[in-house]
Amino acid sequence: MPTNKFAAWLAAATVCLAGSLASGIAVGANAPAVSQKLDNATCQTCHDGKKGKLEVPKSDGEKRELHAVNTDKYGKSVHAKMECVACHKEVIDNVTPHQKVAGAPKVDCAQCHLDLWEAARKDNKAAEKPRLGIVADNVAAYKKSFHAKPNKDEPTKLNAICSDCHNVHTFDVPPRGTQERKEWHLAVPAVCGKCHEDHLEDWTGSAHGREAEKKNFKTAVCSDCHTTHDIVGSSTDKAKLSITASCGDCHKDAYESYKASYHGQVNRLGYAYTAKCADCHGSHAIEPSKDPKSRMHEKNRLKTCQKCHSGKENKPPLATAGFLSFSPHGNSHDFAKYPEIWLTTKAMIALLVGVFAFFWLHSGLWWYREYADRKSGKNVPHVMTDKLPPEFATKHVKRFGPMWRVAHLLFALSVMTLVLTGMAAFFPETSWAKTVMAAFGTPKIAGQVHRLAAYTMLGIFAIHLVVITIGIARNWKNFRFFGPDSFVPNWKDMYDMIGMFNWFIGKGPRPAIERWSYWEKFDYWAVFWGMAIIGGSGMMLAFPHVVAAYLPGWVFNIAMVVHGEEAVLAAVFLFTVHFFNNHFRPDKLPPPDVVMFTGTQSLQEFRHEHRAQYDRLVETGQLEKYLVDAPSAPFTLASKILGLVLIAFGLTLLVLIAIGFAGGGH
């Protein structure tokens, strides 16, 4: 019996031991991956590609091939010191197929780099890892890009992820300036072309692509135009504006001339509806303008222009053959190529220098003479009543009727509106120009306001001509073209000008001025010049389809130069010389002089300013015919307020123009 019990006990023990061993083996088979060897060398025993291709099933049951990892290249990459499982956290064993942890985070290049950068910043080691900061900036740009948006056809996927462009196992951007970096740069189109096959084909056959084949490392590749990470849809304004600027990185001269055109001015203001580089030259299949395949070839150019200048609803009028001789990249620096632009520009510069040299000198000397006289007590304005009859002491002289005053006010308002809207386009890269355009809404609206102001000014000018003509016709027998009441310059104006300069330098008395001084006549006739030059060129630019039907296209190049430069001359002259003559001379302080608003001038001031006319009227007994009561106090106050507002607005415009020039706008 004991023997049987012992045998039974032994059998039971054997069964238990066998069960335990079996259980241990089973547990070992399901042990966590951390207990297994998962270093890079282990991974590479399969993933180096030397044992044939590796395939894994996709969610739809199909198989996909895994890329082989070149051990040598991985060892030279930026990730060389990282373990495979640092990214592939879901892999927990070294058996094929791998057992994976359910719910493990997927590989996320962007978040990993952001976490590393944040850790470096917290540890105050950001300065030691500048490249990581650049990567973090790239990640931020990528997350806002078109590539980071859901794919239209497969919404569960993004348009592109990091590994679509970067081989994460061999990634290593060569240092700038090295031959390797140049080679890497030329390889960019091949990467982009994996998705953008049609664009790659167009680019490869283009002028840029052919240069790449010749190993011209300066040629443009995808990233030069579209950037590397901050990529947005090509139909967006941001893309259109940035790509246009990118063209200028290589084509500097062409871009500078483009910026000077109306197309470029609107573009620089931040609006993308005018023609840009790609609209004229194409985007990928770009050819030199002499190539018959080029959009800008002489046989294709008109058709290209007509894509925008189509005459359709909400589009500019149809471009005509005259457009062909317009030089979109004409400049004032190349006489051999653009002689008409060169000559026009030089003539305008000479005009500006001549006008301002004379009149700023005139103003400076005048200020000095009046200031010196006031300081010495030789000339106290508006108090010369010793010889006036008592009944005239408070009287005013009527100088301008209601029609002229209203015309002057409307003219001033239209000119200031033209300056505001025009100079915003003339200096588009200034912050104030962008603010002005935003206030109007768009350059289109600002352009409409600009033209409305121009038509108002032209209308006032036309009415003035009609009234003047009728007045001369009615008084034809007595009117003297060179008489004292005429605006036509005469010999006395020359003598007065010489006399003024003698007075400025203390070599003679102040000359007695007639009804219209020589500087007032200059102001008057300057309007005729401005209407012809600024108005004429403006009408040409406003109606190019009409002009191009009769004149060659290069007249638009001249019109652009003349319109802008002459407008600057007029604006700066008005807000410096004209303002000084009428408001800021020592005898006129404090401003404003309100004669153009009240229409009258005190008799004392009239005698001081127009002594020759005063003496003539006294001598002929006509003075009383011009005398009127002084305007009421409320009307005078309102006139002063209006005058100060206009002066303030004009000086503000002058400051904005100065900011434009100081910023290198022109």
Per-segment meaning from a language model:
Residues 6, 16, 24-402, 432, ...:
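Short sequence/structural segments immediately N-terminal
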Residues 8, 52, 173, 233, ...:
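A generic signature of intrinsically disordered, low-complexity regions enriched in glycine/proline
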Residues 1-17:
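Bacterial N-terminal signal peptides that target proteins for export
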Residues 23, 27-29, 42, 123, ...:
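Membrane-embedded alpha-helical bundles that constitute the cytochrome b-like, heme-associated redox core
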